[in-house]
């Protein structure tokens, strides 16, 4: 039975107790509304560790002024039932008041890595992400933490935080979980209309076309980006907000590709903004 924990004090006590008995803790941070991508990470954590903790916390610090924090789906009962079925040990479900009893005097600022891609459109977003993840790491003290490669920029920033702040934690990036037709699983997919849902598969198809170009020897970012743009404008009604190619995990924009990259895109449909990416190894 998955145990719900709502206070920092109890979570810290449990973590200390498990550590004192040389038990390994796996941690999957989420904002809830769990889908198969989250559950795959939970399954991996259960396989890898003695205990698995899943946090469900909608973090206000990572929402901008034009982003509706109150509208984010909150489905703790359904989430808890899914975690219980898998055999997760604990769900850490603190309130905002528990995590932030007073306005923070200190926070973590992400510099260059947050000034591109999603970070450029959402100022302060990654500061909020890194601040809460840092707090969660200190509360739960995991040995391994699991993050999805679907949010590749976030993964790269978390890896950098662990490196620079000397957290004794292994970060495990998990492959993007997709629907049978290739659409990346996301809590936002429920906001797509039927027609948009059919079109949304073209995001991944455009990335696969880009990879084919790369594998065939193309190294010009402009050529690859043009191919993605043409495919998306032809096959979807969404607004293309970004197509970019960056080195990974350094997050340096590429004009002439020389090494490991990730190709990222963002498309806005009527009620949902979808992102997707693929990481391409140097051939």
Swiss-Prot record:
UniProt main location, coarse: cytoplasm
Entry EC no(s): 6.3.2.1
Active site: 38
Binding site for ATP: 31-38, 148-151, 177, 185-188
Record GO terms (molecular function): ATP binding; pantoate-beta-alanine ligase activity
Primary enzyme class: ligase
Keyword Cytoplasm belongs to the record: yes
Pathway, per record: Cofactor biosynthesis; (R)-pantothenate biosynthesis; (R)-pantothenate from (R)-pantoate and beta-alanine: step 1/1
SUPFAM superfamilies on file: Nucleotidylyl transferase (SSF52374)
UniProt xrefs under InterPro entries: Pantoate_ligase, Pantoate_ligase_C, Rossmann-like_a/b/a_fold
Family: Belongs to the pantothenate synthetase family.
Miscellaneous comment text of the record: The reaction proceeds by a bi uni uni bi ping pong mechanism.
Protein name as catalogued: Pantothenate synthetase
Organism per entry: Oceanobacillus iheyensis (strain DSM 14371 / CIP 107618 / JCM 11309 / KCTC 3954 / HTE831)
Gene of this entry: panC
